[in-house]
Amino acid sequence: MPLEKQREALKGGVPRYGETPADCVSRFDTSAEILKTPCGDGIMVWRRWGEGAPVLFFHGNHGSWTHWIRNISVVAERYSVFCADSPGLGDSSLPPSPYSLECIIDAFEIGIKDLISEKVPIHFVGFSYGSAIAANTALRFKERVKSLTMCASARLTATADIPRVMKSWRRASTDEDRWEAHRHNLAEMMIAKPECIDDLAVYLQSKNAPRARIRTKEFIPRDSLINALIGLRGVPMLNIWGKEDGFFRAFLESKTELIDAN
């Protein structure tokens, strides 16, 4: 799609007034340049909007590029926005077996080398699980990292034991029950204010969760993020938290041990 038409497609609310969640996602999807790079025995799917310095967005676990749907149009006004579906999630194929952090990062490294010109500086942005993937990918391009931004990074805490009561959407007997399970889980995991859990948020969760085909907690070490950050000393970094995030207090309690000491 020509850049001017893409910009027109990205204008307006997310969603626009009267636009259904499905139509909103379709608008962003059809306006994107779809790119494919190798991943295991299949492909890794990337979406690109805008032009300028590259900004790479890394989504959270059980997610896809749509985790960034409210950010894309703003950032694409000044930058080239790249959103990849991480291996085993969203539209991307499974990574090679046995699964490991390294095989996930390998796929990102191959993709970046294919899609972005050599030596061009890159901004890396990660949400939750995506923060660990962003940081470890950035480590392979250390001389090209313009900045690293991490949002809600539970791996920057010393504990994973935050009590949450989740509902199984898989065992829901009706579409309505399944929808409410996704709404409940968003409230437990991601969104503190009930009024912010709109139909778009629940729709995205309902489409992303069933496409998660790997359990990353089983093979990605908890210290993978902090170890990458140690290797990235000197890189401009930004760490963003919601003050009601269950892990935020744990982050503050862990900061002296995990961040300041390193």
Language model features with spans:
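Alpha/beta-hydrolase fold catalytic core
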Residues: 1-55, 77-79, 119, 262
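Active-site loop/oxyanion-hole signature of alpha/beta-hydrolase fold enzymes
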Residues: 39, 82-126
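Conserved HGGG/HGGXW glycine-rich cap/lid loop of the alpha/beta-hydrolase fold
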Residues: 45-91
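Conserved alpha/beta-hydrolase "nucleophile elbow" surrounding the catalytic nucleophile
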Residues: 59-61, 126-131
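Conserved catalytic-core motifs of eukaryotic protein kinase domains, centered on the activation segment
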Residues: 67-69, 92-98, 160-162, 250-251
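Flexible "cap/lid" loop of the alpha/beta hydrolase fold
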Residues: 132-139, 146-176
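Conserved alpha/beta-hydrolase catalytic His-Asp/Glu region
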Residues: 159, 176-234
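Conserved loop-alpha-helix segment in the C-terminal half of the alpha/beta-hydrolase fold
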Residues: 238-262
